[in-house]
Amino acid sequence: MDVFLAGTDSLKLTRLARRDPELLLVPAGDAHLTRRPAPPDLRALRICLPEIMSGFSPAAPLELDFFTRSSRSESRSLSSRALLATLPEDAFLEVLHSDGDPWADLGNETCRLFVESPGLNLVRMEQSLRMMVERGALSPNAALFRLLTFPMEACGSYVRDPADPAFGACLFELEPIATPERILALIDEVSGIRGLRNARLAAGLSQSGSGSPEETLLSFAFKLATHLGGIESPAFLENEPIAWPHEDLPFVEHTMMRPDFHWPGHRTAAEYNGRVHVSEAAFEEDQRRIRDYQSCGISAYPASYKNVRNIAALNSYLACVAHSLARREGPGYESHVRWALADEGSTHMRTVLLSQMLPAVPSEKPSW
């Protein structure tokens, strides 16, 4: 039994697999061309699916992909999509056990589970969000900002809770399952499906390395144009190691650091520390890191949830970082940022950005 999950159910299993060290997500090549799924046995499907996905019903149907109209299931408990678009290799990932075995042995047959690759899932998400916009449930800008969050998660080192992505706890320090370049390459090879333009835009604005939902928020607050709520900062690196200059090594306590955001040519770094650090050990580690940055001539700006929890706090933090960047960019850049932070339209967009990207529960990132 070959099962190709679609849309939100595909995303749910993708997140579950990323969180489970006993599971792998492996590019499936041309499985969507060679395996050709048939309508599944619903009883067997309930048995082999994870518990959080096995309660599908006519009121909450399971989303599945089929690749011909004739192969679609007629069951009201399944939302069967005939995916007739032209898809490249690796448009899907297979969920395997860490030893390489397929999902489940049902005795008389093997159950193989496939999920949409991050690129295809991004297109599906765009379609779903567009329907919400058409129903008046979301504004177009809110839909765009929500769309931007997924490629940053897939290309980053965190994953949201599959059962409750808005309120559930994230898991951190994971391997990414995509890069923006791979997502864009897949989207460029797809044809015959809606949602490609906005999916391509979202992938083009994303970058690898985000370590938490709050870092994703800050990344876009830094990089987006002012009419979208950002401060149009110069390009930066995310979570890439800094190797200290040899002459500075006698003065630092860490041989290497990995700032969340780093502008190498501007001698500026920004770090998101999760919840407020209240323990003595965490406070001392914060101080050591700041001293190391200062010893090497880098202005570092640590942030916690209180710096992003509302528009006033976020504006204040962005102004501080912009002030440091202006030493290289010039006073005109800082004036432009201050105008954007005071402008009603830009502030409104930043408020929408916060509403779609700020997690309801602060991320509890691991200590250094």
Model-inferred region functions:
Residues M1-R194, G332-Y333, L341-W368:
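Short gly/ser-rich loop at a beta-strand->alpha-helix junction or flexible surface loop bordering the NTP-binding
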Residues F172-W368:
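Surface segments flanking catalytic/ligand-binding clefts of nucleic-acid enzymes
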